[in-house]
Amino acid sequence: NLTQFKSVLFGEMAKRFSLEKEAELFWQDERTRAKLGRWFFDRPRDLPIVIASASPEFELQSAAKILGVPRLIGTKCDAETGVLIGKNCKGEEKLRRIGEAVGAFEIRAMYTDDAKADGPLLAAAQEGYIVTHGVLVPFRG
């Protein structure tokens, strides 16, 4: 299954280099930052925002900091060993974890590059967008 595959993959990677450091370097790279959509930076600042991803949290910590997002929810993974802790954070599990982290919530706008994996979140959102190469396309379920 995907969770086992990710554990093996990250476990092998962790043997070769620091997963946290590599992720930090990736997000600090100007080429990576240049690919981030302007729409994100131009968003209304009065709404709470959460990054919720199937990626390991250590991969996105620097991104959350750069983007000014205070809440990050991702797949739990030991960055030293690469072993996943618990379930992969996608689909219904992602919805559950968001609720666990923030309590009762509503999704005003949902942005994703994977409509299939994030179907439950798109279905719960007032507005949904598919992001392709930084371009937003309204989701039509």
Residue ranges: model-predicted function:
Residues K21-G141:
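C-terminal cap/substrate-recognition subdomain and adjoining C-terminal extension
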Residues N1-E20:
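Alpha-helical membrane-targeting segments
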